[in-house]
Amino acid sequence: MFFGRRGHVIISKGIYYLKGNLVLKSDVNLHLEKDAYLLFSGKADDFLPEVWTRWEGTELYGHSPMIYAKHATNIAITGQGTIDAQGGREFASWSQIEVSDRNRLRKMGEKLIPVTERIFGKGTILRPSCIQFMGCSRILVEGITIKNSPFWTIHPVYCDNVIVRSITIDSHYPNNDGCDPESTSNVLIEE
């Protein structure tokens, strides 16, 4: 069930290399047909400039997730294709060395440093989620396969009316949780 009116972005069969993030706007369904393969670069600098995000419960401006939406309504990612974030290329090694940046971010949150001053971009080490929705509503993720996330796989934050249905996640790096709703209401996750 997709609620959009604007239209579909259809990714047909084939391998598509992406250098940088893909930003979803309102009323759009990103539809991956069978045997469509989105292959992200897996290189940290390709996911700059920083975007408003949340990392383990603390807001910041950091590396963009591979697929990102902010304040969008009626958005979907559907189909039978595959999204490969290539999280192991560069990001996997970060889990061992991100402790100081993680601690610095948490201290900034505890001290109530304004989010706009919590900048963790180039030269910092906090892995991004693969797919993140920030402050969005009426979201559908259905049927796709997601591989090799650098961190949490699907991460809705401050969202409402989220459906995640019949997806496959194949990711074996540290913290590759499947779906991590944070401060989000009306969420349905089902096979």
Region locations from a protein language model:
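Extracellular/periplasmic carbohydrate-active domains that bind, remodel
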Residues: 1-191
